[in-house]
Amino acid sequence: SASELSERIVRTTKGTAELESMQAIFPSITKFGMAALLPGRSISVNDSMDVLVDGNSTRSTLERSAILNATPKASVAIQYNDLLNMKKDERRELGAGKDVIYIYHNSIDAIGDKAPTESKVFDACETAIQELSGILRIIVNELSGTNIFITADHGFLYTYKPLNESDKIDRKAFSGNV
């Protein structure tokens, strides 16, 4: 999916795209990956399996935005759908004076994380590529974005068969600093 998005960006914009990979955090699930993409010195997990950055919760977009605001850069975090539903003037106001804007898009997770819909994950990837291509236009045209980084909090391996118990790790294996 990343390669397809990169190719589409090059085809439809006057810009360039570079595709790089890196090691995902373990376990490779959304709440850990989103925390790993935030600035901070430490990532930890409490007994309720909440992921913390420098002791601060990362559960909600508001909490992740607070972590961003603790850095010297002027920044904000927002959900993709919230940004999309804003009027043009509201989006411009949101981006005014910001050095960094985190836009969270989770349509693949929303489909792939649930057993009844996980077989639709490939369609969700195509939808995500279309939506991300569209949001790029908003970032460039309305938010004056020039350097845009599209990241993934984790990858996924899709199988048509359920995982064996031996493929899973007990949650008790994770506690404290990661």
List the model feature ranges, each with a label.
Residues 1-178:
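Feature captures the catalytic ectodomains and active-site-proximal regions of enzymes
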